Amino acid sequence: MIIHNLGIKDYTEIWEQMKEFTAVRDSNSYDELWLLEHYPVYTQGQAGKPEHVLNPNSIKIVQSDRGGQVTYHGPGQLVAYVLMDIRRRNLGIRTLVAKLEEILISVLEHYRIPANIRSGAPGVYVGEKKIASIGLRVKNGCTYHGIALNVNMDLSPFLGINPCGFAKMEMTQMSHFHPNIQLEEVSQHFVQYFLTQFK
């Protein structure tokens, strides 16, 4: 597993790089984890419906090829893209999603933030509020896209959409529990727990 810390990047640029990486990889290619933040952007998943974008204002909307509905990415949100040959690892996509949810819950528990999952609504929640989203694409047995964890960001752009297709879905973030939390530190803990699941 190769880990890349990419800083803050344009969504479309990284999406193209993920597709290119996945298209040229072979059975000997290492799996990779890309850690980054994005400039403000709304992304529609393959199941995304236009009516879930309520008021985008000046924020760009990108029609993506990941699973799921519309979400928002912006600075202060930890994005981790999982470029993994799940066929080689004998993993199903549902098992991978469940493992990613476990990793996110472990990170949150490290900070004593009580997190949970919800049946039929992938991602991680604190009470009824969503704190992390998951959206993946599988091509030729290999995944790309991944997770987004709200760390210390401006949540107001989520008000311009129905997050993940749920009307009035409230969002939360780690800084509500730890005001001085740093994304870099959270990223390190994410990698630590990720590598306990995936060598």
UniProtKB/Swiss-Prot annotation:
Location within or outside the cell: Cytoplasm
Q: Which residues does the entry assign to the active site, renumbered to this chain?
A: C164
Q: List, alphabetically, the Pfam families matched.
A: LplA-B_cat (PF21948)
**Residues that hold substrate according to the record:** R66, G67, G68, Q69, V70, T71, Y72, H73, S133, I134, G135, G146, I147, A148
User: What GO terms fall under cellular component here?
Assistant: cytoplasm
BPL/LPL catalytic domain boundaries: 27-199
Q: What EC class is this?
A: transferase
Named from the GO MF annotations, one term is: lipoyl(octanoyl) transferase activity
Q: Where is this site: Lowers pKa of active site Cys?
A: K130
| UniProt-listed CDD domains | LipB (cd16444)
Question: What reaction does this catalyse?
Answer: octanoyl-[ACP] + L-lysyl-[protein] = N(6)-octanoyl-L-lysyl-[protein] + holo-[ACP] + H(+)
SUPFAM superfamilies linked to this entry: Class II aaRS and biotin synthetases
Superkingdom of this entry's organism?
Bacteria
Chief subcellular location equals cytoplasm
Instruction: Specify the signal sequence span.
Output: none
What GO biological process, any one, is recorded here? Answer: protein modification process
Q: What is its EC number?
A: 2.3.1.181
Q: Which Gene3D superfamilies match?
A: Bira Bifunctional Protein, Domain 2 (3.30.930.10)
In which pathway is this protein known to take part? Protein modification; protein lipoylation via endogenous pathway; protein N(6)-(lipoyl)lysine from octanoyl-[acyl-carrier-protein]: step 1/2
Note in the entry: In the reaction, the free carboxyl group of octanoic acid is attached via an amide linkage to the epsilon-amino group of a specific lysine residue of lipoyl domains of lipoate-dependent enzymes.
Function description: Catalyzes the transfer of endogenously produced octanoic acid from octanoyl-acyl-carrier-protein onto the lipoyl domains of lipoate-dependent enzymes. Lipoyl-ACP can also act as a substrate although octanoyl-ACP is likely to be the physiological substrate.
Task: Give the family per the record.
Answer: Belongs to the LipB family.
Spell out the PANTHER family in the cross-references.
Answer: LIPOYLTRANSFERASE 2, MITOCHONDRIAL-RELATED, OCTANOYLTRANSFERASE
- The protein depicted here goes by the name Octanoyltransferase
Q: What is the lineage of its organism?
A: Bacteria, Pseudomonadati, Pseudomonadota, Gammaproteobacteria, Legionellales
